[in-house]
Amino acid sequence: MLFERVVRPTLFRLKGGDAEAAHEFAVRRLAGLARMPAALAVLRARYGVSAPRTVFGLRFPNPVGLAAGMDKDGLALPAWPALGFGFVEVGTVTAHPQPGNPRPRLFRLPDSGAVVNRMGFNNAGAGALAARLAALPRPLGVPLGISLGKSRITPLEEAVEDYQTSYRALREYGDYFAVNVSSPNTPGLRELQDRAHLDALLAALVGEKPILVKIAPDLPEPAIAELLEVCLARGVAGVIATNTTLARDGLAPADQAGGAEAGGLSGRPLADRAREVVAFVHRETDGRLPIVGVGGIVTPDDAGRMFDAGASLVQLYTGFVYRGPALVRAAAAAARTP
C-alpha cells in the first residue's frame, strides 16, 4: 500500500525519527488539504465508507472514529471525514492553554506496533478551540466529540469548575463530550475516577449534550464497577474504554528501551486489556451503556473483536499511525450489525 510503503517511511524519517515532529507535519499537511475541496473529494471517493448506526442519539456514518490526541486543537477537522472516519474527537482540551510536558515526549515502538506518550495535555485552550470551531463551515458531516481535561495549574479541588469552563466555551460546537479523567500524564488526574470526585464532576456536566467518561485500563474490576455505578446514576451517555496504560506487557525485545520511557502506552500491546475492559463494562451494565472501544486496534480483526466484546463504536489512533487510512475503511467493514 502507498501509505505503508511510501508515506509512513517518509514520516518516520523526519528530523531523525522525531515522532512528534512527524505528527505535527502530518497534521499541518492535512490542515492544508482541508482547505482544498477538490482534494477532499478525491480522498472521500477513495476512503469513504458507509456503515451507519445511531448511538446515544447521534447518527454516525460509520462506527470508526478518530481518537482524541491526534488533532488536539482541531487544525485539520474537515480532512478526517474525508479519510473515512465516521466521527472525530478533538482534544484533550483544557480551560487554560498549556504547553504540556517537555520534549521529547512521544516515542514510537515499531516492532510492537505501539507508541508511548507523555504529552501532558498540550493544547491552545478551550477558548482558542471554540474560536476555531466557530469559524468552520458547518455541519462537519460527522459527529464531533470534544475531549475535556483538567488544566495542570488547577488544583484537584477546583477540577469541577475547570471542566465546566471548558464545557461552557465549547458546548454549542460539540455533538458529544468526553470527560478525560484517566490520562496518566497529568499529576493527580486519575484520582478523578474515584467515586466522590467523579460524582461531583458528572453532576456538573451531565444534561444538555451527551457526556462520555474515558476510563483507564489499569483500574481493577471492582474500581471499574464502582465507576460504572456513578456513571449510570448520573445518566452519562456512554463510556470510552480505554485510555493508555502504564503497563509494559507484550513489548518486542527491540522496543524495551523505548518502552522504559515514562508515559502511557498505546497500540497493539494494549489490545487484550482494552478488549477485556470493554467486555467487562458491557457485562456489568447489561449492555445499557454504549461503549466506544479504543486501544490496540491495528488490524480489521482487532476492530471486529472489539465490536464483539460489546463496543458500539471504535476509535483509532496508534493503528492509524502505523496503517494509515486503509485501516479506517477495513475496520468499518469489520463492524457487526448492531
Curated annotation (Swiss-Prot):
Topological relation to the membrane, as annotated: Peripheral membrane protein
Binding site for FMN: 68-72, 92, 147, 180, 214, 242, 267, 296, 317-318
Cofactor(s) the protein needs: FMN
Predominant location: membrane
Ligand binding (substrate): 72, 117-121, 180, 185, 243-244
Manner of cofactor binding, per the entry note: Binds 1 FMN per subunit.
Subcellular location: Cell membrane
GO cellular component: cytoplasm; plasma membrane
Keyword flag Electron transport: no
EC number(s) stated in the UniProt entry for this protein: 1.3.5.2
Family annotation (Gene3D superfamilies): Aldolase class I
InterPro entries per record: Aldolase_TIM, DHO_dehydrogenase, Dihydroorotate_DH_1_2, Dihydroorotate_DH_2, Dihydroorotate_DH_cat, Dihydroorotate_DH_CS
Keywords for this protein: Cell membrane, Flavoprotein, FMN, Membrane, Oxidoreductase, Pyrimidine biosynthesis
Top-level taxon: Bacteria
Active site annotation, chain numbering: 183
Catalysed transformations (reactions): (S)-dihydroorotate + a quinone = orotate + a quinol
GO biological process assignments: 'de novo' pyrimidine nucleobase biosynthetic process; 'de novo' UMP biosynthetic process
GO molecular function: dihydroorotate dehydrogenase (quinone) activity
Pathway listed: Pyrimidine metabolism; UMP biosynthesis via de novo pathway; orotate from (S)-dihydroorotate (quinone route): step 1/1
Family to which the UniProt record says this protein belongs: Belongs to the dihydroorotate dehydrogenase family. Type 2 subfamily.
The protein's assembly and partners: Monomer.
Role: Catalyzes the conversion of dihydroorotate to orotate with quinone as electron acceptor.
Official protein name in the record: Dihydroorotate dehydrogenase (quinone)
UniProt organism field: Salinispora arenicola (strain CNS-205)
Encoding gene (name): pyrD
